[in-house]
Structure formats: structure tokens, C-alpha cells
């Protein structure tokens, strides 16, 4: 790994990104390089540097000190770049096949240089196009199971876990989730964003005391339960995929939180894609939900039985209790994410990309009804087949 002297923060340009790649020695001397800024996210600059002869490339990602979606009036910590690079390295120690390689990071410049995954496609885009990604849910189920187990009190020494958790204290980005996922959509807040035609539907949510109580319970879990190292923002836009490969990216929201959170986020985004499809094309999404949970429980359970360091792990019923609570939490977190992505600050192309306005509004009303029931009825769901049942029951 190359080492260069850090300097004071300044935003990169394509020219500076190219110079950095050369200084790091990641390409042969004299290689003709092409650099393009490709970032389309809200929080970062992303540059793709490619050797024009071999077509081999790297990605240079730099955190911005503000959210692009809002501007400099919304300052953000640059520490999230360190969180991201450390999370990728931590995940790589357990599931290297599911994350990009990190070549270099610079804390003061808020830069991470990593493997080029441009030969893959962002899963959200592919799902919108109708791709099925047959191994996506198997890979994500394994990713979540292994990263959760090995960073939990069951998979690592408890004192070492506490030290690791300290290195992933991430208050600024957790605050974004606390507000945009668990709070703002349930109240009349300026950050919310929805069509005028949905106002009556949204007001119903704002005045729903039962929904508020259950959302508050889920927010409390997010705030207080430091179970495992989470990706923190595991939606289909944070995953590169092909028919046989899956890579998880962008863990700048990583922190120690409740086991079910990443599961719920991923499931929610599968549901959001299903909401955008006609009935005849939804089955692959529900199959993915089934497999995600099945693989997660299988892998997590096997690790529990064979590698747990917790004395109580052999106690009959404890694993079942952990898995049951994880499922209930995942259902509730999925409901919060579905509602947030429908009426909150950051929408998804799955719903917003529906061309016919009437169909788009119908899908969003469906999303609000589904999200509500996932939250308030989460403890009543017995398994992933109940996602199908609630989906159908809330369609009209």
C-alpha cells in the first residue's frame, strides 16, 4: 500500500484525482489515464480513473463537508470517510467476496481509494430494468449473517467488541437516520417531500397515535441497541450486482446497532421495487425476501452452534429468541424505510420513476398502507410469507 503525506482538506477535481492515482503508484509509469467524475449521490465526490490501454481502473471517493441535496447549509462530518474505509476493511475480514478492496485512505482529505466495480451494475437500476439477479439474496443473506455474528457478543470477545464499537461511533450520520427514517415522515416536517395529491393520506399517518407509538419503539431500538456492526444504509442503491456476483458499497453510515436493521432496510427496498411492478412481475422480489431471511438464519445459526464464544449460547431457546426478535425488528424497520422513501427527503427511483401519474400515486398510497402495517403488526408476522399477505391486503 502506498503512503503519501496528508494535507489539509480540499475538494478533488478530475485533474487532482488523476494526480493522486499517479502518486499512489496504482498505475504503471507513463500510463495514459482517463478520469471522470461519476458520483450521483448526495454526500460524496466519486472519480473513476482508468488506464486507457489496459482498461483497468480504480475508484477515488471523497466525502464532502455538506449534503449536495441540501447544500452547504447542511454541514456533515468528514469522519464518515474513515468510518467507511474502516467498515469495508472490517467486513473484508469476514466476507471479502462481498466488498470492494480498499487500496488507500487519507483521513484529512476524507478519501478512500478502492477497487473499480464498474463492470457490475447498481442493483436498484437493474431491478428497475427487470433484472432478477438470482444470487443477490443469497449473497446479502450471507453478508448480513457473517458480519452480524462476527461483530456481536456471540462471535467475538465482549471486551474486544466494545473497543470495536467505540471506533464506529457515528453520531452525525446516525442523526440523519434518526430524523429522516424514524421521525420526520411521521410528523409535519419541512424535510418531507410528497405530491399534493397524497396530503390526506400523509395527514392520516401524522395523526395515527398507534403508528407513532410503534415508530417510537423502533427509534428507541435504533438509538440504544448496540448489537452488531451494521452497514447502516443497506439499500439496493448501495449494492453492485450481476447474475453471479454481489458487492456491498458505501458503508459510511456504519455503526453498532440492532441486528435487524440492515435486514429491514434491504427487505424494504425489495418491497419498494415490487410496489413499482405489475402483479405478474413481483414474484422474484418476494422470492428474494424469502431467501434473504432463510440464508441469514441458516448461516447465523450454524455460526452460533460452531463458533460462539458466549457461554449461554448452548442454552435451549436462546438462539430462537434472538432470531425471532431480529425478524420482528426487521419487519418494523422495513416499514419505516418504506414510508420514508415514499414521503421523506430521499425518494427512490423505483416509485418516482413510474411514468403514469395515477399509477405512481396508487403505488405510493399502497406503500404508505403497507409500511404502516409492517410497523404496527410486526410482532404478528410469523415468517416472510406474511410480506406477501400484507402486500396483497394493502393494495386497495
From Swiss-Prot:
Pathway: Amino-acid biosynthesis; L-methionine biosynthesis via salvage pathway; S-methyl-5-thio-alpha-D-ribose 1-phosphate from S-methyl-5'-thioadenosine (hydrolase route): step 2/2. Its EC number is 2.7.1.100. Homodimer. One of its GO terms (biological process) is L-methionine salvage from methylthioadenosine. Coiled coil: none annotated. It catalyses: 5-(methylsulfanyl)-D-ribose + ATP = 5-(methylsulfanyl)-alpha-D-ribose 1-phosphate + ADP + H(+). GO terms for molecular function: ATP binding; S-methyl-5-thioribose kinase activity. The keyword ATP-binding applies. Catalyzes the phosphorylation of methylthioribose into methylthioribose-1-phosphate. PANTHER family: METHYLTHIORIBOSE KINASE. HAMAP family: Salvage_MtnK (MF_01683). ATP binds at residues 44, 61, 115-117, 250-252. Gene3D superfamilies: 3.90.1200.10, Phosphorylase Kinase, domain 1. This is Methylthioribose kinase. Substrate binds at residues 233, 340. It comes from Geobacillus thermodenitrificans (strain NG80-2). It holds the Pfam family APH. Keywords: Amino-acid biosynthesis, ATP-binding, Kinase, Methionine biosynthesis, Nucleotide-binding, Transferase. Belongs to the methylthioribose kinase family. InterPro entries: Aminoglycoside_PTrfase, Kinase-like_dom_sf, Methylthioribose_kinase.
Amino acid at each position: 500500500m502506498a503512503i503519501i503525506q496528508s494535507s489539509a482538506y480540499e475538494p478533488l477535481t478530475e485533474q487532482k484525482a488523476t494526480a493522486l492515482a499517479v502518486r499512489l503508484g496504482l498505475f504503471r509509469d507513463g500510463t495514459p489515464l482517463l478520469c471522470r467524475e461519476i458520483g450521483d449521490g448526495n454526500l460524496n465526490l466519486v472519480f473513476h480513473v482508468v488506464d486507457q490501454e489496459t482498461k483497468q481502473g480504480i475508484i477515488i471517493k471523497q466525502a464532502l463537508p455538506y449534503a449536495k441535496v441540501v447544500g452547504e447549509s447542511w454541514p456533515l462530518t468528514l469522519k464518515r470517510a474513515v468510518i467507511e474505509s474502516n467498515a469495508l476493511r472490517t467486513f473484508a475480514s469476514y466476507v471479502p467476496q462481498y466488498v470492494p478492496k480498499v487500496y488507500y485512505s487519507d483521513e484529512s482529505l476524507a478519501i478512500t481509494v478502492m477497487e473499480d466495480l464498474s463492470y457490475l451494475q447498481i442493483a436498484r437500476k437493474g431491478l428497475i430494468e427487470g433484472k432478477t439477479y438470482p444470487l443477490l439474496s443469497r449473497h446479502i443473506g450471507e453478508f448480513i449473517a457473517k458480519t452480524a455474528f462476527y461483530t456481536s457478543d456471540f462471535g467475538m470477545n465482549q471486551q474486544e467488541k466494545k473497543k470495536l464499537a467505540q471506533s464506529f461511533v457515528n453520531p452525525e450520520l446516525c442523526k440523519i437516520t434518526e430524523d429522516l427514517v424514524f421521525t420526520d415522515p411521521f410528523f409535519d416536517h419541512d424535510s418531507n417531500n410528497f405530491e399534493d395529491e397524497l396530503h390526506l393520506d400523509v395527514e392520516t399517518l401524522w395523526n395515527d397515535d398507534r403508528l407513532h407509538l410503534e415508530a417510537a419503539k423502533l427509534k428507541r431500538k435504533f438509538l440504544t441497541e448496540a448489537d452488531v456492526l451494521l452497514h447502516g444504509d443497506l439499500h439496493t442503491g448501495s449494492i453492485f450486482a450481476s447474475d453471479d456476483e454481489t458487492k456491498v458499497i458505501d458503508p459510511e453510515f456504519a455503526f453498532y446497532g440492532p441486528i435487524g436493521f440492515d435486514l429491514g432496510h434491504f427487505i424494504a427496498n425489495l418491497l419498494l421495487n415490487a410496489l413499482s411492478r405489475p402483479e405478474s412481475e413481483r414474484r422474484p422480489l418476494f422470492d428474494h425476501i424469502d431467501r434473504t431471511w432463510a440464508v441469514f438464519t441458516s448461516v447465523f445459526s450454524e455460526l452460533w452452534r460452531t463458533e460462539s464464544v458466549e457461554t449461554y449460547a448452548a442454552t435451549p431457546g436462546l438462539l430462537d429468541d434472538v432470531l425471532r426478535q431480529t425478524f420482528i425488528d426487521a419487519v418494523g424497520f422495513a416499514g419505516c424505510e418504506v414510508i420514508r422513501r415514499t414521503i421523506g427527503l430521499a425518494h427512490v427511483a423505483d416509485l418516482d420513476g413510474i411514468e403514469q401519474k395515477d399509477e405512481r400515486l396508487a403505488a405510493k398510497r399502497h406503500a404508505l398502507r403497507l409500511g404502516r402495517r409492517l410497523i404496527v403488526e410486526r410482532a404478528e408476522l410469523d415468517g416472510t410469507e406474511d410480506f406477501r399477505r400484507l402486500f396483497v391486503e394493502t393494495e386497495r
